[in-house]
Amino acid sequence: MAATLTEAGTGPAATREFVEGWTLAQTLGEGAYGEVKLLINRQTGEAVAMKMVDLKKHPDAANSVRKEVCIQKMLQDKHILRFFGKRSQGSVEYIFLEYAAGGELFDRIEPDVGMPQHEAQRYFTQLLSGLNYLHQRGIAHRDLKPENLLLDEHDNVKISDFGMATMFRCKGKERLLDKRCGTLPYVAPEVLQKAYHAQPADLWSCGVILVTMLAGELPWDQPSTNCTEFTNWRDNDHWQLQTPWSKLDTLAISLLRKLLATSPGTRLTLEKTLDHKWCNMQFADNERSYDLVDSAAALEICSPKAKRQRLQSSAHLSNGLDDSISRNYCSQPMPTMRSDDDFNVRLGSGRSKEDGGDRQTLAQEARLSYSFSQPALLDDLLLATQMNQTQNASQNYFQRLVRRMTRFFVTTRWDDTIKRLVGTIERLGGYTCKFGDDGVVTVSTVDRNKLRLVFKAHIIEMDGKILVDCRLSKGCGLEFKRRFIKIKNALEDIVLKGPTTWPIAIATNSVP
């Protein structure tokens, strides 16, 4: 019998069964080639994230799926999102991964503000720990950014999205990479210019991530001569007076000057980065890298002019660039395969030279076993081919909602919530709304660099209350958070306030 998804219950909170005993609770993310679903085992309560890619609809995704699975089979580390297995059903590929209940790292970054230094330090050192594991095994990630760093239920970093990863070292022999890939604000300058070493390029991305965590904004749109902010940094030309640098203290700056050295040969290694004083300083819980009240740069930091080009992905790439440079950002956990139109600029006419060596190497290196700590009854997911009817499992919905700050409960009924939400967004101007029968409002707009920004608002009825759950679909994560705050503030009169139940507090990330 062909695999199909059977629905149980009715209305926006209906759940469906994937295989017997495993219920589809919600959509976690989506991309050009498929969706990521949350699966819950009704017997054990365990949760798994499942990527679905239909290769009949997207035949160009086949190589990306194969490569991602090959690499993730090799990885078993506490700061790497765990791979549980893969299953094929007809033309559809199902990839089963660890469920990161803490959400995306970008959701913890307050736009234009960042986060306290002790939090940034913790996330940063965990990122470096996971990256060290990858590099020791000869694997480069090549698309590190806050949207690809997930958090588990204990707030530990999990590196995800290995669609652009590759092996740069095998049997002790290291090779240069020549494929230009990644997300423009985070890629190292040498990636846009020539063949490059893998490790310094990944470390550059870590440096940009640290800037966004400390300052709540990106330092530049792209590391090229076309970007004034970057050339000022490169040429040591009055960059100290500009944001985000004017927000950071001298200790953080001393680390970033070495980590974001434009010459990969003088850039800090991973080991020296971890040895830097900033990574070992004991920060107070509420200490930020700057003080908005006392800083002489406060007015500049908060001015519209200073923010105008922050947190935006780059303008269009020049026609000389290769494929796989992403201009947009993906919400957690997005499928790693991306299309030309939605996520990457595919300008190269042929395959990169480095692709040829990956297939055999990965096949030789990949282990056949699944990752450690895999859920009980996982074989049901990997082997079952027949779908069965299920009972409604909405009682587990609260507990399994990924923690996200971009959601809120309202006091209105389901129908009234839809009307208020759509009406409010349209009155704000500059948005296009489309409402689907599944209770999802798709909101489209453009950011300040005229790049597409799409997010979805799911209107979910649960436990007698209505949840407005917003998530990014395409575009910059922090720009999405800015728009969300404006919309939520405009709906303030219907936002649920006051004491809430424990499950509601967990779902909305508002645990006292």
Swiss-Prot record:
User: Quick one: which gene encodes this?
Assistant: grp
Which cellular component, as a GO term, is one annotated location? cytosol
| Principal location class | nucleus
Q: Active-site residues?
A: 143
* Protein's GO biological process: centrosome separation; DNA damage checkpoint signaling; mitotic DNA replication checkpoint signaling; mitotic G2 DNA damage checkpoint signaling; protein phosphorylation; regulation of cell cycle; regulation of syncytial blastoderm mitotic cell cycle; spindle assembly
Cite the EC number. 2.7.11.1
**Reaction catalysis annotation:** L-seryl-[protein] + ATP = O-phospho-L-seryl-[protein] + ADP + H(+); L-threonyl-[protein] + ATP = O-phospho-L-threonyl-[protein] + ADP + H(+)
Q: Enumerate the residue ranges of region (Disordered).
A: 335-360
Q: What is this protein called?
A: Serine/threonine-protein kinase grp
- What GO molecular-function term can you cite, just one? protein kinase activity
Keyword Nucleus, does the record have it? yes
Function of the molecule: Serine/threonine-protein kinase which is required for checkpoint-mediated cell cycle arrest and activation of DNA repair in response to the presence of DNA damage or unreplicated DNA. May also negatively regulate cell cycle progression during unperturbed cell cycles. May phosphorylate the CDC25 phosphatase stg, which promotes its degradation. This results in increased inhibitory tyrosine phosphorylation of Cdk1-cyclin complexes and consequent inhibition of cell cycle progression.
